[in-house]
């Protein structure tokens, strides 16, 4: 959700000085004034914890916010007044909501689309091509937001997204739909990233956690609204309105951003044309893009369209490893012109927030995918009703995300919430993995709510970490890295869960119902399960199906636990100034 760290990270750097408490933004301003006569490189960072404050000589930890002239954001900057901020927030929220809606609205429309285009074999592409292009260009947009005006890069990304949506809605063929989804994915990769950057330039740091949580919570709203809107459009109007709705939202966003958001100057001067081209690390991208496409295709196809041991999947993995290895070497040589600089990789706040985001988002997507499958297969409900039965988790995520954002602004620190999120979500995930066919509402409502509360505590925190702990000059690239890793986490976790589900289902069927055609059962899907299984074998098949789903839940639980590893390195930095 997007688009998330924590312990008392006490650095071991030499020549450190000890302080007695965590530092605030104003404390750092005072320190900066006192040392203004000294020559201090802006890339050095002051590491703080509840018990210590250190200034390491290396640049692995970038200086937190609070400085003005040395490249970090200063909270003394002017922000839009209340009514301008309200208009900007409406525009940003509509853009993020339509982008998130595009991930969920298509599911209930696919049967009608495949009937019209007679394109059942293309269904996999409808779902995979959008996140594929979205993930690949996120880091590129990080560079664009660094060297060009935030307003115009954002509006350009929005325009590409809306063009893709219009192509999807107007296309006369399945191929056109796939192309439109790919174009929309390209644009969406700059929308969420740009929305977070607009927030960082429009909202004071202390209030940013709440606003970030509000925007992030829209993913949960889209998770509920998407299938319902998709079903309504498909049944009462046309499936094409699943895509035509996006330009309506986009027009409002474009108008509000044009009128009310000041066009910020580029964070870095792009220089002349030749210098601009060199800053975009074209050599690195030449290896990165095909490497990521190979990896994501292998994760999408493995265990589904093709066996994991097939030559196609193995070839894709080998290709991705080779290309991404070359990309890493290129990044090492490119230094500050790299797509992912060594300074970013070494910064504990960046890699900690990225790892946390990878795990917590991965866990969320596993349960978002398999809880509706459990309701449809085990409880024998429709796709629409399964979405409603999934509300306890989604409402827990939305409400607790907003509450945690408010809490961070009040107490000043995001790290306690990042510690709590893996613990609470792991407990909830563990309870969800005990699901049985005879479980009633008290169990599936309560367990989902607990898990959703845990997720809500942490989902928005990685972006807050970046906004609070990273210099202004590096914020676009840092948010791009965290967002990119988030997308990758969802692809990896769902791929693992699908493989676990498939293997456990095959094992369970062989043990409980060997006469059932396993391949036919898997391709039938959860909603038609009872039509392809003989009545006398249904109970045994449901036992195997329930076991397969709960084993997939184990993957989500494991990702929740692993999120704590990402929380531990995060520095304790207050988002509050001195009152």
From Swiss-Prot:
Spans traversing the lipid bilayer: 85-105, 121-141, 159-179, 183-203, 214-234, 241-261, 282-302, 310-330, 355-375, 388-408, 411-431, 439-459, 479-501, 553-573
Region of interest called Disordered, as start-end residue ranges on this chain: 1-75
Positions of glycan attachment: 45, 380
Keywords, comma-separated and alphabetical: Glycoprotein, Membrane, Peroxisome, Transmembrane, Transmembrane helix, Transport
Keyword Chaperone on entry: no
Record's keyword annotation contains Glycoprotein: yes
Feature: compositional bias, Polar residues: 1-24, 36-54
Pfam families linked to this entry: MFS_1
A Gene Ontology cellular-component term: plasma membrane
Record's subcellular location: Peroxisome membrane
Biased composition (Basic and acidic residues): 25-35
PROSITE patterns in alphabetical order: MFS (PS50850)
Top-level lineage group: Eukaryota
Phenotype when the gene is knocked out: Abolishes the production of 15-deoxyoxalicine B and accumulates decaturin C and 5-deoxyoxalicine A.
InterPro entries, per database record: MFS, MFS_dom, MFS_trans_sf
Family: Belongs to the major facilitator superfamily. TCR/Tet family.
Miscellaneous note of the record: The 15-deoxyoxalicine B cluster is a rare cluster that contains its own geranylgeranyl pyrophosphate synthase (olcC), in contrast to other related clusters which rely on a FPP/GGPP synthase localized outside of the cluster.
Identification of the protein by name: MFS-type transporter olcL
